Amino acid sequence: MNHLDRLERKIGYRFNDIALLKQALTHRSAATQHNERLEFLGDSILNFTIAEALYHQFPRCNEGELSRMRATLVREPTLAILARQFELGDYMSLGSGELKNGGFRRESILADCVEAIIGAMSLDQGLAVTTQVIRNWYQQLLAEIKPGDNQKDAKTRLQEYLQGKHLPLPTYEVVNIQGEAHCQIFTVECKVKSAGKIDRTFVAKGSSRRKAEQAAAEQILKELDIK
């Protein structure tokens, strides 16, 4: 059994075209044939699959409640938890710079890799099989999730915290965009002033402006120890 056989067992899916899995595991720092296009595809499929599952699971919830629960289930920290369960860091291909910086442990890289694997599965065997695999991954998370304030996304929770303390709201600014139009990486600076323990700028990256802003807000919430 090779190392990718072991990974396939962990994710509960066997590829017909193993090259797709290899590409899904390849970070842009390692090769020109990397996983960002697959990540783009997987992100959309994951959002649809979780949205459909929540729609049927919570027939009395409104659109806002469903959106918040979906955001909780597909956000970067949740995907990073799945990645660690699969031990994706042991299988990823990273450039030397990312390896030195511990990229195989970074939440954003792990989360992107999960989405890329979803995209690869959809190209390999289609949507029906892929959505079932995703449901298998999320079985426990879907069973545990409930509507409520704790499902609000990071930006909303940060804004409400600052408003409650009568502090200035954070400002978000895109400071860099890398890559071609179909696979861009956004770098966002989030500035927070006089928020108790912090008064500084946080920097985060994501495959969209929204993801980068949410990642920056998550950093601040962790700094403030807000669950």
Curated annotation (Swiss-Prot):
Pfam families, alphabetized: dsrm, Ribonucleas_3_3
Enzyme class: hydrolase
Localization in the cell: Cytoplasm
Domain of life: Bacteria
Active site, UniProt feature: D43, E115
HAMAP family: RNase_III
Protein name per Swiss-Prot or TrEMBL: Ribonuclease 3
Underlying gene: rnc
